Regions:
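Conserved small-residue
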Residues: 4-12, 122-234, 265, 272-313, ...
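Conserved SET/PR-domain catalytic core that frames the SAM/AdoMet-binding pocket
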Residues: 135, 225-226, 236-250, 347-352, ...
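Short, glycine/acidic-rich beta->alpha junctions
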Residues: 42, 53-58, 223-226, 232-243
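A short beta-strand motif that forms part of the nucleic acid-binding face
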Residues: 79, 90, 257-261, 270-271
Length: 433
């Protein structure tokens, strides 16, 4: 079927005059007859052929119920094409005095699938009715830009062929073991205090992808991106949930597990809870930034060398503001500090007991049930090996309470500043009179 998109401001086809501030007419600084002269702005250009965004979905599915409905399977595969996306159009000559108009200039393609498998049964166990159910779900989707006005191939915005969520950055090959080792590596075209950055023992070994002997980011365009490559993707992949429950002799147990099988996240330079003192010298030292997790350098000679290379340290030589300069050595995304933000979480576990009817009758009750429930009690993520300061479930969600956005631009980086999912334990009783 085909649908429109209602999530767009109405009356976009009308040329409207706007003014700064909340008033429809602004006040200028020019005073005539004791009054500020009002003014408004010239309306932006609007294409003549603005129309609805259109979403067309093709779907094929399979449903199976086997063994008297004890085993159920559902599978779906879909393709969704979004056309006439309302976005910015081609640039206009500056002499025209108007910004590029918005119109139906882009399109998007999405492919995805969903699977679910359920198993349920009931029988007598120890002379008492016993029942259980297990349901697992797994789903995935990917989206690509199929049309977008980006004549220069600028990587800081959308472009034709882009997969939503992709992260561009540098490849790395470990850490330099000595100054002599670093001198044999490519020069860094990262300007710090106006000078070419030089690598030392304990710094990251960046990979010279284009082989020109210098680490650069080019013009950050498709045709000239220097040594930048796609190193990851922040979109959640292979999302899943497992729901289990059982009941026997008045005792009930249920669990819900949920997670993401694949997702990348890169900590932005202002993510102080990740970078610690690598961001600013007065920041706290994170507990994972101690011991053999950090390079140890022998500076007794001019040829500095790392003394704990056999421990495979994760954190490079500590350089103040290394991750907080416009062109510092750790400012640009790289696969060494790219975080695996996949996770599995116990969303809920509940244990309950329903009292027998004869006990309820003695208490003059219709029903009595007590329960103990916990939420978000357990979470595991590969990211916790390097930092446990972030909640992987909401790491890209963002909170309006934080001034800085959780994500920065289109490159999948971000502060990760989101309120974590709270752990809660509830003890309750249900009474029916």
């Amino acid at each position: 079927g085909s649908l429109g998109n209602a999530n767009i401001d109405p009356y976009q086809y009308l040329e409207t005059m706007t003014a700064s501030g909340s008033a429809s007419i602004a006040k200028s600084s020019v005073i005539i007859n004791g009054q500020n002269v009002p003014y408004t702005s010239v309306p932006s250009l609007i294409p003549d052929d603005i129309t609805w965004e259109k979403v067309t979905t093709y779907n094929i599915g399979l449903d199976l119920d086997l063994f008297h409905n004890r085993l159920s399977f559902t599978g779906d595969y879909y393709r969704r094409n979004t056309t006439d996306l309302y976005t910015v159009g081609p640039n206009l000559p500056q002499v025209l005095g108007s910004a590029a108009p918005y119109g139906n200039y882009a399109s998007l393609k999405t492919k995805g699938w969903e699977l679910s498998l359920s198993l349920r049964d009931s029988f007598n166990l120890g002379g008492k009715p016993f029942s259980y159910s297990i349901k697992g779900m797994l789903w995935d989707s990917r989206s690509w830009i199929t049309d977008y006005y980006n004549e220069t191939g600028d990587l800081t915005t959308y472009y034709k062929g882009m997969e939503i969520g992709e992260i561009w950055g540098f490849r790395t090959a470990g850490i330099y073991a000595s100054n002599a080792d670093a001198l044999n590596g490519p020069a860094y075209n990262f300007f710090k205090n106006g000078e070419m950055f030089r690598a030392y023992a304990g710094d990251l070994r960046f990979v010279d992808v284009d082989g020109d002997g210098i680490m650069t980011k080019g013009n950050r365009t498709l045709s000239n991106h220097g040594d930048l490559e796609i190193i990851g993707n922040q979109s959640p992949r292979y999302q899943y949930s497992i729901n289990m429950s059982l009941n026997w002799n008045g005792i009930g147990l249920s669990m819900l597990w949920q997670g993401v099988g694949k997702r990348d996240w890169y900590p932005w330079t202002e993510s102080g809870f990740f970078w610690g003192k690598w961001n600013r010298a007065y920041n706290s030292l994170m507990k994972t930034q101690t011991g053999d997790n950090v390079v140890r350098i022998d500076k007794s000679t001019d040829n500095w060398r790392v003394t704990n290379m056999d421990k495979n340290p994760y954190w490079t030589r500590m350089v103040s503001l290394a991750a907080n300069r416009n062109d510092g050595p750790l400012t640009w995304e790289n696969d060494h500090y790219l975080q695996d933000a996949s996770y599995i979480r116990l969303k809920n576990i509940t244990i309950d007991y329903t009292f027998p009817k004869h006990i309820c009758k003695k208490l003059r009750l219709e029903g009595l049930k007590v329960y103990l429930s916990g939420e978000n009690l357990f979470t595991h993520s590969p990211m916790f090996k390097h930092t446990d300061m972030f909640d992987p479930e909401v790491i890209t969600s963002g909170d309006s309470d934080f001034a800085a956005s959780t994500t920065s631009g289109l490159n999948g980086t971000g502060n990760g500043y989101s309120y974590p999912m709270l752990k809660t334990v509830t003890l309750g009783i249900n009474v029916t009179f």
